[in-house]
Design a protein with these regions (language model features):
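N-terminal Sec-pathway targeting helices
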Residues: 7-24
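Charged, low-complexity intrinsically disordered segments
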Residues: 12-14, 77-78, 82-84
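Hydrophobic membrane-insertion alpha-helices, especially the h-region
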Residues: 20-35
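Hydrophobic single-pass membrane-insertion segments
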Residues: 33-44
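Primarily the internal scaffold of c-type cytochrome electron-transfer domains
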Residues: 48-76, 83, 98-173, 180-185, ...
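Local sequence-structure signature of Cys/Sec-based thiol-disulfide redox active-site neighborhoods
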Residues: 80-97
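A short, surface-exposed interaction/processing loop segment used at functional sites
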Residues: 191-223
């Protein structure tokens, strides 16, 4: 018969052992911390309200503890949650079918997409590109429904070495001017590939910033700031779009800059529209119509993406405490970000970069004479793509909505075609 120590003796020995005392102390501290964490989690992480969200402090996940909800785990992508107040854009089509269908042809709606056989504008027959500065060869390959970038070098005998193949997960850019290509890691990170399709020249080339011997290769990280203007807001966990959070994205991303980037969240509007007891005025008031906003707020809807002081420096600075996806149409853009300009010695009228259209608008006589009534929407219909063949007549008609024919001081003449400077380097 096996003999053992009495229970009382065992307990006395445990309390007498310093190592046991230390173990018990750690357990007690852990229990207290867990209770404190559970009791204060809502207080520390609840998003603040109002136009100026305060800094949110959130304890980091403890070693061995529960992970932050929605955070990427090894081998997993972030678990998406529905963005509050937003709905899939196709729900807008139930009442606005004509506008919805027309908008699908506009560049903004096609700014981000999956590679698809029905959406090919590239030349995959003439798919080879050699980049002299880095001495690397590239081939863009289509394998059924899959797009692949192949990169390699040649040895002294002309044989391929250092071969890398990377499948393409996403296309960024509408293709009006160019298209770039991204791949997504299991952790949810997005990286840009070096090769771009340039539509105007119908050719492959290096992406902007890659035309040098020591470029980023396949390691250029796509940040939330990049995605802000290239896509609709993704479905991410609250707080995951703030400063210091990793730039990770769910697998199921929106495809294109949708209706709600300009009109605001549409869930409440749709819910009220489906209730026959709700007055029409209340339904209309539940969605933002930029054309009915005060002039500065109206312009801010466009300026959130179409105003950048310079691409050479960090000129768009989001206010600390604001998430990347926290701007809503109808809010002052200055509450969300700050535009930092620089003085290079030239008059502003002589400067023009990719997103300087608002500067030119504010310099125009029409804008000044109308006290700001002239806006982007005066000439541009964001729901419609104007084809090159109809552009001259279309924009002439827009001018004539304000100007009579006898107001013209110059003889009508054709427009001289110009090409934009090559900014790929």
């Amino acid at each position: 018969m096996k003999r053992g120590l009495p229970r009382a003796s065992t307990a006395r020995n445990l309390w007498a052992d310093p190592r046991s005392l230390g173990l018990v102390a750690l357990v007690v501290i852990a229990l207290i911390w867990i209770r404190f964490d559970a009791a204060t989690a809502d207080t520390l992480t609840r998003p603040p309200t109002g136009p100026f969200p305060a800094l949110v402090f959130k304890p980091e996940p403890r070693l061995g503890g529960q992970p932050t909800p929605g955070a990427a785990q090894p081998g997993q992508l972030p678990r998406p949650t529905t963005a509050e107040g937003y709905v899939p854009d196709r729900q807008c089509a139930a009442c606005h079918r004509q506008l919805y269908n027309s908008y699908q042809h506009v560049g903004m709606a096609r700014s981000f997409s999956r590679p698809r056989p029905d959406n090919i504008i590239e030349d995959f027959e003439n798919n080879h590109y050699f980049h002299g500065p880095s001495k690397r060869h590239y081939e863009m390959i289509r394998r059924d429904d899959t797009f692949v970038m192949k990169r390699y070098q040649l040895d002294d005998t002309g044989q391929p070495i250092n071969v890398l193949e990377q499948e393409i997960d996403w296309i960024i850019g509408s293709g009006l001017h160019s298209r770039g290509y991204l791949y997504q890691t299991q952790a949810g990170e997005l990286y840009q590939l070096p090769i771009v399709w340039y539509t105007q020249s119908q050719s492959w080339g290096m992406a902007p910033g890659y035309d040098n011997p020591r470029h980023d290769g396949v390691t250029r990280l796509i940040t939330r700031e990049c995605m802000f203007c290239h896509n609709a807001y993704p479905q991410v966990s609250p707080g995951s779009d703030r400063y210091g959070q990793p730039h990770v994205f769910p697998r199921d991303l929106p495809q294109g800059t949708g209706c709600q980037r300009c009109h605001g969240p549409g869930a409440a509007h749709i819910r009220l529209a489906n209730d026959l007891n709700v007055p029409v005025a209340e339904v209309v008031a539940a969605i933002v119509n930029p054309a009915r906003l005060a002039a500065p707020l109206r312009d801010d809807v466009c300026f959130q993406c179409h105003l950048q002081p310079t691409s050479k420096l960090t000129s768009l600075v989001r206010r600390f405490g604001r998430g990347d996806y926290s701007y809503r149409p109808g809010q002052p853009l200055s509450d969300y970000l700050v535009h930092l300009d620089f003085d290079d010695g030239r008059d502003r009228s002589d400067r023009f970069e990719i997103n300087h259209h608002p500067y030119r608008l504010h310099q125009s006589t029409c804008y000044k004479a109308s006290d700001g009534a002239l806006s982007c929407l005066t000439c541009h219909d964001p729901h419609r793509k104007v084809t090159p063949t109809e552009a001259a007549a279309y924009y002439r008609a827009r001018c004539l909505t304000c100007h009579a024919l006898d107001d013209c001081a110059r003889v009508e003449m054709g427009i001289v075609s110009t090409s934009r400077p090559d900014r790929r380097g």
